[in-house]
Amino acid sequence: MSSKLEQLQALLAPVVEALGYECWGVEFISQGRHSVLRVYIDRPEGILIDDCEAVSRQVSGILDVEDPISGEYTLEVSSPGMDRPLFTLEQFAKHAGEQVKIRLRSPYEGRRNYQGILRGVEEQDVVVLVDDHEYLLPIDSIDKANIIPRFD
């Protein structure tokens, strides 16, 4: 996770948690002159639109005061959804056994994209089984990771 994302996570997580939600993760996507700050919230009973609105109001207030992002951006608050992104080793461990899609920042063992069964974590590595081969992917090399929902 980049230092900018770590800074945003550290700023926003206490606000989200004070409202009774888990701050699942934060993404900042630069899109030219206009960017998107996406905050994922979760709780055991699920997330409703009213929850997103309440968190958005509080987070927006903190962002206005602290002003950690230069330039224009849109704030989006949502649940992680069925294809939830994974950000932390704890999240990867919690979802062991599920299908995942992982994209690395740069190639590792000759490839950048991995899709397979999440086996868990070992120290600072995410373990994924792809075509009967187990890969240990350093958490710091992961650009994006998502659960692949099953519909069976």
Curated annotation (Swiss-Prot):
> What is its subcellular localisation?
Cytoplasm
Give the primary localization class: cytoplasm
- Output one GO BP term: ribosomal small subunit assembly
Q: Per its record, how is this protein called by name? A: Ribosome maturation factor RimP
Which family is this protein grouped under? Answer: Belongs to the RimP family.
- Keywords assigned by UniProt, alphabetized: Cytoplasm, Ribosome biogenesis
Q: What does this protein do?
A: Required for maturation of 30S ribosomal subunits.
- In terms of superkingdom, the source organism counts as Bacteria
Pfam family name, one = DUF150_C
- Keyword Cytoplasm present in the record's keywords: the answer is yes
User: InterPro entries given for it?
Assistant: Ribosome_maturation_RimP, RimP_C, RimP_C_sf, RimP_N, RimP_N_sf
- GO CC annotations, alphabetized: cytosol
Q: Which organism encodes this protein?
A: Pseudomonas aeruginosa (strain ATCC 15692 / DSM 22644 / CIP 104116 / JCM 14847 / LMG 12228 / 1C / PRS 101 / PAO1)
